[in-house]
Curated annotation (Swiss-Prot):
A motif (Di-leucine motif) lies at residues 142-143. It is found in: Endosome membrane; Lysosome membrane; Cytoplasmic vesicle, Phagosome membrane. One of its GO terms (biological process) is heme metabolic process. Its main location: membrane. The keyword Lipid metabolism does not apply. InterPro entries: HRG (IPR026218). GO terms for cellular component: cytoplasm; endolysosome; endosome membrane; phagolysosome membrane; plasma membrane. It comes from Mus musculus (Mouse). Keywords: Cytoplasmic vesicle, Endosome, Lysosome, Membrane, Transmembrane, Transmembrane helix, Transport. This is Heme transporter HRG1. Belongs to the HRG family. One of its GO terms (molecular function) is heme transmembrane transporter activity.
């Protein structure tokens, strides 16, 4: 079932806001706190949110109808970065526990765990929307063949 224009607009707005938030986390944790783990995962979350935004905009413009192979690529990219985000989450959690870091410290690896989870969320949403939009357009292309 195709999403309504309102749903697409809300999804696009949320993705756009989250991409700005991810990029701002990248710059703040790179320049101010000098914590590369949190900066990298915040930047990855911003890039993935931007990718989800592009997916929604291309769906609204009906671009995917002619390029279903691109949606398959988006699906696999989302799956790849889901695995990367989960492994980063486990790594940062293990580092934070073994180094006995504080939950309140902005330089701790616990904050990197949070942004790893947010990156996982956006990678999962990229795969989910690519799968749904591909299924939606695949149904339409099957009907147009007859």
């Amino acid at each position: 079932m195709a999403p309504s224009r309102l749903q697409l607009g809300l999804r696009a707005a949320y993705s756009g806001f989250s991409s700005v938030a991810g990029f701002s986390i990248f710059f703040v944790w790179t320049v101010v706190y000098r914590q590369p783990g949190t900066a990298a995962m915040g930047g990855l979350a911003g890039v993935l949110a931007l990718w989800v935004l592009v997916t929604h905009v291309m769906y609204m413009q009906d671009y995917w109808r002619t390029w279903l192979r691109g949606l398959r690529g988006f699906f696999f990219v989302g799956a790849l970065f889901s695995a990367v985000s989960v492994s980063a989450f486990c790594t940062f959690l293990a580092l934070a526990i073994t180094q006995h870091q504080s939950l309140k410290d902005p330089n701790s690896y616990y904050l990197s765990c949070v942004w790893s989870f947010i990156s996982f969320k956006w990678a999962f949403l990229l795969s989910l929307y690519a799968h749904r939009y591909r299924a939606d357009f695949a149904d339409i292309s099957i009907l147009s063949d007859f």
